[in-house]
Amino acid sequence: MMLKKALVCGAGGFIGSHLVSRLKRYGYWVRGADLKYPEFSKTTADDFRILDFRELSNCEKALEIGSGEKFDEVFQLAADMGGMGFIHSAECEIMRNSALTNINMIHASSKNDVSRYFFSSSACVYRDMNPEESELNEDDAYPAQPDNEYGWEKLYAERIAMAYGRRFNIPIRIARFQNCYGPEGTWEGGREKAPAAICRKVAEASNGGTIDVWGDGTAMRAFTYIDDMLDGIIMLVHSDLENGVNIGRQEYVSVDELVKIVIEVAGKNIQIKHIEGPVGVKARNFTNERIKNLGWESKISLKEGLSRTYSWIKSQVEKKSS
């Protein structure tokens, strides 16, 4: 029996590296490709290529495989991205680098007869909303009103993937991720997202100390643990769901509540100091009915996921300071 072959673009990143491991567990032959190897663990990919997807020729190299063979599934997760601070400070870089990557990869895939193509989009394609509003469904991405350029680029990339899918008869599967977190994600340097940044600050703070939090702490968010997100990706790819599909845990908390959960799992007594900084939208709540109809559900509570993530980040902080 021939093994299914998968190409994971962005396999050096957080979700991509975890996805490689999950696909290997399912018996795939996996090639990973990215600008860098995974930072915290050795890749489990059968083959790994260091490639810059802003060049079309590199996308073609990623798709090179034996004569008469092709990739059954291409997972496009490569992107120039980070937390809210990075998104607001690097708009041009995000739009240029990610747009080139997405244009080139879907174009190369269309020329290489791939059987199925997955694109990782984001809840950032949706507009700002008030916490008391009804949850957004997938159709509410239009009329388009993303609040930042990262969201606009994601929406454009969705459309170009779907256009190529129609022209070349490629099944396209698109996930709109809610915030994803977990061990082995970026936790320092400016590109880390809120859960990792907060875990780092709490780990570094002395008991009885204070940590800085951007904004007034009232912005509402939902966060999805990496294992749950991977379940959703696999289910979506093997389904017949077209267009963007929301994947995310519907456990909404304010930023201050998020901080307090991390402080609790750390077993510390720490005060919050609000400071000026980019905070993004007030809220972005969406419905998960389409992915839930496939049998998906989030199994890891926010507290449990943050406990696992905090333990890992604490070990990284201790390792760096030793």
Q: Predicted regions span which residues?
A:
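Flexible, glycine-rich beta-alpha linker
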Residues: 126-127, 149, 173-194, 220
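Conserved catalytic-site region of short-chain dehydrogenase/reductase
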Residues: 84, 119-135, 149-155, 167, ...
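Active-site Tyr-X1-5-Lys
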Residues: 145-173, 197-207
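Rossmann-fold cofactor-recognition segment
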Residues: 44-56
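C-terminal substrate-binding subdomain of Rossmann-fold SDR/epimerase-dehydratase oxidoreductases
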Residues: 204-322
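N-terminal Rossmann NAD(P)H-binding glycine-rich loop of SDR-like oxidoreductase domains
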Residues: 6-26
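Conserved Rossmann-fold NAD(P)-dependent oxidoreductase catalytic core, especially the SDR/UDP-sugar
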Residues: 103-147
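NAD(P)H-binding glycine-rich loop region in Rossmannoid oxidoreductase-like domains
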Residues: 53-99, 111, 129
